[in-house]
Structures are given as structure tokens and as C-alpha cells.
């Protein structure tokens, strides 16, 4: 039983840095590709008046629901936003980051 608990603890400890790395990667990707218009962090205003702050996206819809759109290509209803399509590994990192910054 002690070995099982030790192994479970080791798995959790090994997963934590990967999760933190995903969050950081997601932040980097969004800052690079979206930060010109959207507020990407926990504070600040979006530079474009119609671009929602990413920390408030969870108020509109579940963050997980963005997974398909991020992987297949995000298209907006307004012409100022270019289409973005992310690789599968990047989508997971972006979702992890977005979840980490949502405000209640």
C-alpha cells in the first residue's frame, strides 16, 4: 500500500511541472498571436474595443468548448480579426492557460 501511495505521489509531482509548462506555453502563444488586440493576462484592457479580454471568456462559454475552434481555425464575425489555427499540442496549452486566468 505504501508503494502505491508513493507512486501516485510521484506521478502527481511529475505532472505538476508539465501542467505549469503548458500554462506558460499557452500564455506565450496567445501573447504572440492575439495580444495585439486582446487583453491576454489577468489584468488590463484589450487594445481593440471589440476584442474581449481572455480572462472573461469563461463567462461566455465553457473554455473547453474552444478546443475544436482553436484546432480547426478561429473565425470571427468582424473583419479585423485574422483566422488562427493552432497545432494540437498548442491547443492543450492554450486551454490550460485560459482556464488558469478565468475570473469568477
Tell where the protein language model's regions lie, with residue ranges.
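Periplasmic/extracellular electron-transfer cofactor-ligation site
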Residues: 21-50, 72-79, 101-104
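Short, structured coil/loop segments at alpha-helix boundaries
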Residues: 3, 20, 27, 87-88
Amino acid at each position: 500500500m505504501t508503494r502505491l501511495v508513493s507512486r501516485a505521489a510521484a506521478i502527481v509531482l511529475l505532472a505538476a511541472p508539465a501542467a505549469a509548462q503548458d500554462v506558460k506555453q499557452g500564455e506565450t502563444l496567445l501573447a504572440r498571436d492575439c495580444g495585439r488586440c486582446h487583453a491576454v493576462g489577468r489584468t488590463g484592457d484589450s487594445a481593440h474595443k471589440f476584442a474581449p479580454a481572455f480572462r472573461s471568456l469563461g463567462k461566455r462559454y465553457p473554455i473547453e468548448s474552444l478546443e475544436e475552434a482553436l484546432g480547426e481555425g478561429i473565425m470571427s464575425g468582424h473583419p479585423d480579426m485574422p483566422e488562427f489555427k493552432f497545432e494540437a499540442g498548442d491547443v492543450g496549452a492554450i486551454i490550460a492557460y485560459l482556464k488558469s486566468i478565468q475570473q469568477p
